[in-house]
């Protein structure tokens, strides 16, 4: 019988629970105050399955060691259980012979993810081999071949880090903006076991970045060399946005198993509502990471120069009702709103990659959209609850925030600013299209207004 890998210990995350912090005094670190004892108990909730003393977040839910081992063994060995009492047995640690079928169902109900067990087993390989076979750590299907670029077969096998050093005058870390090791204050990197959804989004985002490196490559540009960003025109910006539709749609499907189970009409409703918000949120996030002011970074890693909007609209005066200078004057307030209410706020809050992914989850799984089914609403609620649990774990145990709830509230407060910026942008595009102020491709207008398939 194949040996089941043992549970990875979580002592690094829990070490701080047994010591006190220095709050301006020389209190010995070995003393334990009542407040510290309370905080330690609070930060280790009981097992969500059997209510036994918890051992932290495992496979996406708070669980004790026994339930964690039971769930791993059940999934790894593909166990099939049968309940003899109508699948309504009590699951509690004080029951000597607990119904295994109901116990497993309870594990799934509280959010434990079977895929994390399988991927954990796949990752049980010697460290020396990991650098040569990174595909075993991935949890999505391979990136499809994109026919837009003939040379798409030569996709680099290593992760395409987001390197913003070319925007800066001073050297920066070689770490990716999306690498856990690059985040300030991290005591340990998150894992697929402790944060399955957010970590899966990060892994798949890196793969989408590799695909972008191919799709948005300029003629004569080598995909294996570091891209040199440049200011782009309005026409080029619309092309980038149009190409992003299929890439982002694939990323969403790679990240959420629940999405793949929905009917096509529900998938369309969710994605049409999400795409333009995601584009603007991601641009703001990448702009903040670039460290430069007066620009907005696109998915292609090129940028729009706020200080030269006439150059941005230089190709828009053919057969339209305005010159580049007039168009720039008309559109500038919209760009200023993006900078003032969204980019500056994200810079102030210093949003990191996992917080960015959590915002993406909140945006995508919206509630009460026109035509959205009750089933789709319920699926979205469950996914958002899962990511909330993971963010609580991340902020408390990894980033060491004393008040993770306040931090989460600060991050979520970005969403109203994003909504204002998107609505203003949509209004400007609609006005330009109606009055023919500048030439707009029909498919781009439909994308911005969420009317595409």
Swiss-Prot record:
It is found in: Nucleus. Residues 44-119 bind DNA. It comes from the Eukaryota. Keywords: DNA-binding, Metal-binding, Nucleus, Receptor, Transcription, Transcription regulation, Zinc, Zinc-finger. Residues 1-37 are annotated as: Disordered. Residues 178-451 form the NR LBD domain. A zinc finger (NR C4-type) spans 47-67, 83-107. It holds the Pfam family zf-C4. Residues 18-36 have a biased composition (Low complexity). One of its GO terms (molecular function) is RNA polymerase II cis-regulatory region sequence-specific DNA binding. One of its GO terms (biological process) is regulation of transcription by RNA polymerase II. PANTHER family: NUCLEAR HORMONE RECEPTOR FAMILY MEMBER NHR-86-RELATED (PTHR46011), NUCLEAR HORMONE RECEPTOR FAMILY-RELATED (PTHR46011:SF7). Belongs to the nuclear hormone receptor family. Orphan nuclear receptor. This is Nuclear hormone receptor family member nhr-12. It comes from Caenorhabditis elegans. The gene is nhr-12.
